[in-house]
């Protein structure tokens, strides 16, 4: 009887052990059962170790990055504090320089004013001195011009005697 005819007409099982390759399947399944867990287990174990190593490396990098970020934040806040301190110091310094410049300008203006007053005073003093000198010269000239008319011989002798007495007293 031909069993393959029955198989074409529907579902059927072939129970002939040598025709169905059940032995081959059994050997393959047994081999897979026996050797595959060790082979695949080693591959999966290596893969698992690689993944765990990569995870640990990623965690270490994350930790380092977090620490670097914290340090950078501290450095930034320190730099901001230093910048604000420098700004405050520069404002104080510029204010003191401005005040010093104003003080020097006021002192210079006072000195210039005093110099102008001094120049004006000395000029006035020179003018007064010149006027006095001219007045004295004019008075002496006038006195000398009027003296010959007013002095006679006795008055002149009395004047000379009086001048000599004044010199002896001193």
Swiss-Prot record:
MF term (GO), any: proton-transporting ATP synthase activity, rotational mechanism
Stored Pfam families: ATP-synt_B
Membrane topology reported for the UniProt record: Single-pass membrane protein
Cellular compartments annotated: Cellular thylakoid membrane
Entry's transmembrane regions: 22-41
Protein keywords: ATP synthesis, CF(0), Hydrogen ion transport, Ion transport, Membrane, Thylakoid, Transmembrane, Transmembrane helix, Transport
GO CC, alphabetical: plasma membrane-derived thylakoid membrane; proton-transporting ATP synthase complex
RNA-binding as UniProt keyword: no
Keyword Ligase attributed: no
Highest taxon of source: Bacteria
Main location class: membrane
UniProt-annotated stretches for the region Disordered: 72-98
Function as written in the Swiss-Prot or TrEMBL entry: F(1)F(0) ATP synthase produces ATP from ADP in the presence of a proton or sodium gradient. F-type ATPases consist of two structural domains, F(1) containing the extramembraneous catalytic core and F(0) containing the membrane proton channel, linked together by a central stalk and a peripheral stalk. During catalysis, ATP synthesis in the catalytic domain of F(1) is coupled via a rotary mechanism of the central stalk subunits to proton translocation.
Subunit record text: F-type ATPases have 2 components, F(1) - the catalytic core - and F(0) - the membrane proton channel. F(1) has five subunits: alpha(3), beta(3), gamma(1), delta(1), epsilon(1). F(0) has four main subunits: a(1), b(1), b'(1) and c(10-14). The alpha and beta chains form an alternating ring which encloses part of the gamma chain. F(1) is attached to F(0) by a central stalk formed by the gamma and epsilon chains, while a peripheral stalk is formed by the delta, b and b' chains.
Similarity field: Belongs to the ATPase B chain family.
Protein name: ATP synthase subunit b
Native species: Prochlorococcus marinus (strain MIT 9301)
